[in-house]
Curated annotation (Swiss-Prot):
Family membership: Belongs to the beta-lactamase family.
InterPro entries reported for this sequence: Beta-lactam-related, Beta-lactam/transpept-like, Beta-lactamase-like_AB/R
Signal peptide coordinates: 1-23
Gene Ontology terms for molecular function: hydrolase activity
Gene3D superfamilies: DD-peptidase/beta-lactamase superfamily
Induction remarks: Expression is induced on squalestatin S1-producing YMG medium.
Organism from which the protein derives: Phoma sp. (strain ATCC 20986 / MF5453)
Name listed for the protein in its UniProt record: Probable hydrolase M10
Length: 595
């Protein structure tokens, strides 16, 4: 029996209530499974990046600069670029730059601290990330700072509203008299220096936790807690003290035992190696500077090889089974920036130049003296980039764009081609099913995989649903029914023909093809489960794939209670799949919404 208009109207009403009128700027992200790369799949892109980056570093302003860039997937390092300073007299360390050259990696140190905190929380040593920090460090009080309102989560996300740095970054102690004079700052009486930390006045004295806590008790807040994002290296120093209080182990030893050694980061430490193995500038005192209690935020020394190993771990693992480490926790400055633990998250449509397809970059960036380090993680593409430099750089916007933008474009093309080859096509009922039903899935750069045709028992469903959904939404007729992976796999079953089948779940949603950026068109409400039929989700599709080859064999439409083989299959493919289809609530061959 065919769909009746009453049934279609009810479905359309439920869809419009469940998800709202979504415009193309609300197209779901991650329109493909996580891609994989071969040794050659990105080769042409890397050749282009090499030429572009090489030209940049040929500039005279970089003649006294050492540079190391690596790109890795979750499986292996895919590409590297090393640039040694042409002016070798500017260097006091190694004049050959490679994967094992040691750099000071500044705020990239925060990655290890954040991982350690999240693991301790996962293991139950920290009861809640929303615990106030003064529960664990009571000697922060008494203070004018509201430590009872500042949580571990606030410190991880840099929204505690507290001071940024301790023991450095003070113009009086870190600038020369000439530089201070150029700023026309007033003279400072000698007795006013008595309140400054001893480790700031004399850099040969490492800053310690007792001095930090004493200094914080007399400090004042920068902002009200969890009101606005403002970087705080001091916050990560407190997280380092928290680790020590919980574990009874020195921060540096704990990080070494739980992360550096298990991950075989053999050239990573909190102590400077011999300068002959490092990227060290002539007359630079930062290389050997012991930052003490600031180690959790800026103290680490590491190599491109080790950082790529760490980034591979972040792509493969999560420090927490309870949360998505890459997800944002708070707003940052600007319309494209968010904050995470400890990420600075940048979302932009610039790489793909498609208004509804933003790319998310999880970054950590920082400098310490002449050393600059950046890591960029792109989880949806299974890629990460590290950049380490000593010498001239400024903010690394330009170099990052030259590396990441063409990389994202190439990775996106690979991912969509994989979707087209594996999932796109027509899935049609076999004659033995005795029903005229099919679904056609297509691929576009804007929307990834989408339903371009749906036939139920001889009736074309999408045009009717588009019209009815439009009448309920108040405008627009060009609806796109986009499918996205859920990253859920259901049962693996072995068929009578000894074929192992994987059931891979996807969901589809609908967006209205209106231009973004007009009025409230960018206001997005998301639901991938807006309506069910007899308890089965209408928007659920389950692809049945051969576990060995990865080839898609069929798709099961849960709400319609039917499994449709893909395209031209070998004889009897549906019979081979019997016993592997989903346990739906009606017999195979019946469509639930057909009567």
């Amino acid at each position: 029996m065919r769909f009746t208009s009453t049934i279609l109207l009810r479905v359309a009403v439920l869809l419009s209530l469940g998800g709202g009128s979504q415009t193309t700027s609300c197209t779901p992200g991650q329109p493909f499974p996580i891609p994989a790369y071969s040794k050659t799949s990105l080769q042409q892109t890397f050749e282009q990046i090499f030429e572009t980056v090489s030209r940049s570093f040929d500039n005279e302003s970089f003649h006294s600069t050492n540079v190391a860039i690596e790109v890795t997937s979750s499986q292996e390092t895919l590409w590297s670029f090393y640039h040694a300073a042409k002016n070798q007299s500017s260097q006091d360390g190694s004049t050959v730059i490679g994967p094992d050259t040691v750099f000071r990696v500044a705020r990239v140190s925060k990655l290890l601290t954040a991982i350690a905190i999240l693991q301790l929380h996962d293991q139950g040593h920290i009861s809640s990330l929303y615990d106030p920090i003064n529960i664990y460090i009571p000697d922060l009080d008494p203070s004018t700072v509201q430590w009872g309102r500042i949580t571990i989560w606030d410190l991880l996300n840099n929204v505690a509203g507290i001071l940024d740095m301790y023991g450095y970054a003070d113009i009086y102690t870190d600038f020369s008299a000439r530089q201070r004079a150029d700023l026309n700052l007033p003279p400072v009486p000698e007795d006013s220096l008595e309140g400054m930390p001893a480790c700031q006045v004399d850099k040969s004295i490492p800053c310690d936790s007792a001095g930090l806590l004493s200094w914080l008790r007399s400090s004042r807040a920068v902002f009200e807690p969890h009101r606005i994002n403002s970087n705080s290296n001091v916050g990560f120093s407190l997280l380092g003290i928290l680790i020590e209080r919980i574990t009874g182990i020195d921060y540096e030893r704990f990080i070494s035992q739980t992360l550096i050694e298990p991950l075989h980061l053999n050239s990573t430490s909190f102590r400077p190696p011999h300068k002959n193995s490092g990227a060290v500038l002539q007359n630079d005192h930062t290389w050997n500077w012991d930052v003490g209690v600031n180690n959790p935020s800026v103290g680490l020394y590491s190599t491109p090889r080790d950082i790529s190993t760490l980034l591979r771990w972040t792509l493969n693992e999560s420090p927490s089974s309870l949360l998505n480490w890459f997800a944002p926790g708070f707003y940052a400055v600007g319309s494209h920036s968010l904050i995470g633990m400890p990420w600075n998250i940048f979302r932009t449509t610039a790489p793909l130049s498609i208004p509804n397809r933003p790319t998310t970059f999880n970054t950590v960036v920082g400098t310490l003296g002449p050393y600059t380090s950046v890591v960029v993680v792109m989880p949806e593409y299974d890629l990460a980039v590290s950049l380490m430099m000593n010498g001239a750089l400024g903010h690394p916007h330009d170099i990052l764009a030259k590396v990441t933008f063409p990389l994202v474009r190439a990775a996106d093309k690979i991912a969509l081609e994989k979707v087209r080859d594996n999932y796109a096509g027509t899935y049609k009922a076999e004659p033995r099913q005795k029903i005229n039903s099919s679904i056609t899935l297509s691929v576009s750069p804007d929307h990834g995989l989408y339903i371009s045709e749906l036939i139920s028992n001889g009736s074309s469903i999408l045009p009717v649903m588009e019209r009815l959904a439009s009448s309920k939404s108040g405008g627009g007729s060009n609806w796109i029914f986009q499918a996205v992976p859920t990253f859920l796999e259901t049962k693996r079953r072995r068929t009578p023909h000894d074929r192992v089948v994987v059931n891979e779940e996807w969901r589809w949603t609908y967006v209205l093809d209106k231009p973004p950026g007009e009025g409230w068109n960018d206001w997005c409400l998301s639901s991938f489960d807006p309506v069910t039929y007899a308890g089965e989700p209408l928007t659920k599709m389950v692809f049945q794939k051969d576990a060995k080859s990865g080839r898609v064999l069929s798709v099961a439409l849960s709400g319609y209670n039917i499994t449709l083989p893909k395209g031209v299959q070998e004889a009897g493919i549906f019979a081979q799949l019997e016993g592997t289809s989903l346990d739906l609530h009606a017999q195979a061959g019946q469509e639930v919404l057909a009567g």
